[in-house]
Design a protein with these regions (language model features):
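Active-site nucleotide/adenylate-binding loops and adjacent lid/helix of ATP-dependent enzymes
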Residues: 2-9, 71-74, 82-189, 195, ...
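A short acidic/glycine-rich loop-to-helix N-cap element
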Residues: 273-280
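Short, solvent-exposed loop/turn segments at secondary-structure junctions
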Residues: 12-13, 58-59, 84, 150-151, ...
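Intrinsically disordered, polybasic Lys/Arg-rich low-complexity tracts
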Residues: 332-355
Length: 355
């Protein structure tokens, strides 16, 4: 019996095709890969796929519903569509604090405009005025205001004082925003995590144009660099195991030698060869192909084949949120990405732009 691995994708081109080609090139007995094909979606009816890699359902609700049905009927969907639907960035920050992973000081802000079909009576539980001074004293200025959910670097604002915040908050409509401490950093990293075990730590410059963000090098050197990479590796695994993501990126801004998690809710992260570079692209294609094959071999159509994070697992078992079932492995010598060419652009200040 042949098991199919499907990839569901949108406008991206380089990663999906390379992924399918890589899986098929491995010529594993009983495993083939292709782009997902959907002709009709019947309730409680299985798909043709043992494994589906999801790269687009965050933008297409029809696909998200299709994937939930596929998962219910035994497909191993990467990433878990039920958790992805429930997850958002403010919760991620809250969970990170319970896990001992440093994050910027962050507060949640109500939307500027009321949600559709609500009135002022819908908000009688909010104090008026809210304790803005307490929030501002906690977070400080400058700060970043960005949506509490979603991504793609959309609707992210740097605010310098309360009046600047009010002015920019006017532009956010019905978006629920969060206000986050600005981190002025000496190093910045973006990290792939595949299968909650494979980690790729990449020097990253979020202030560069999109196609040059990986054109940078690690600034920390010597024993401090080794310690920093080991800590980042630990935090990446800790976060992804708690959240239950099998394909994700985590971003860290390093301030005074401490890696601070800026963004770690990216279940369909950028994997385009023209932005991440050839060597990083090769790594993520290989890691994703190996993960998909492994999951296809393990997949049992009569069971739930989704990955659930330790946050959910421990809740079901009535264990503490921070309970860890096994030790996190030490960082390997192959973890750091190769150094990229240096950018000649000068930088100043910090950023929490990732959203």
């Amino acid at each position: 019996m042949v098991k199919k691995i499907g990839i569901l994708y949108g406008m991206e081109n380089t990663f999906p095709h390379a992924f399918v080609e890589r899986v098929n090139k491995k010529n594993v007995k009983g495993i083939v890969a292709e782009a997902v094909q959907i002709g009709s979606v019947r309730q409680a009816f299985p798909t043709d796929y043992a494994v589906i890699i999801d790269r687009i359902s965050q933008d297409v609700p029809f696909y998200r519903a299709y994937l939930k049905n596929a998962a219910l009927m035994g497909a191993a969907v990467i990433n878990n569509p039920f958790w992805w639907s429930a997850d958002e960035k403010f919760f991620n920050n809250c969970l990170a604090e319970t896990l001992g992973v440093p994050v910027p000081k962050t507060v949640l802000l109500p939307s500027k405009k009321r949600p559709t079909d609500t009135t002022e009576l819908s908000f009688r539980n909010l104090k008026f005025p809210m304790d803005w001074h307490d929030m501002f004293d906690y977070v400080g200025f400058p700060a970043y205001m960005k949506p509490h959910s979603g991504g793609g670097w959309k609707s992210v604002y740097r605010v310098t004082d309360p009046q600047d915040l009010w002015n920019k908050h006017e532009e956010t409509g019905q978006l629920v925003m969060m206000l986050q401490e600005e981190i002025v950093f000496e190093d910045y990293f973006r990290c792939y995590c595949i299968g909650q075990k494979e980690v790729r730590i990449m020097p990253y410059e979020p202030r560069n144009p999109h196609h040059l963000r990986y054109a940078t090098t690690m600034k920390t050197t010597g024993p401090a660099a080794e310690k920093l990479l080991a800590t980042i590796h630990d935090y990446v695994l800790r976060l992804n195991k708690a959240l239950g993501y099998d394909f994700n990126t985590v971003e860290f801004a390093v301030r005074d030698g401490v890696p601070i998690a800026i963004d770690f809710c990216n279940p369909a992260p950028d994997a385009d060869v023209y932005s991440i570079g050839q060597e990083n692209f090769e790594w993520v294609v290989e890691a994703a192909a190996n993960l998909a094959i492994e999951r296809a071999q393990m997949q049992d159509p009569n069971k739930n084949n989704l990955t659930w994070g330790t946050f959910v697992q421990n809740s079901v078992r009535n264990l503490p949120i921070t309970h860890v079932a096994e030790e996190v492995p030490a960082v390997s010598s192959e973890t750091p990405a190769p150094k990229a060419r240096k950018s000649s652009r000068k930088k100043s200040g910090g950023t929490n732009e990732a959203s």
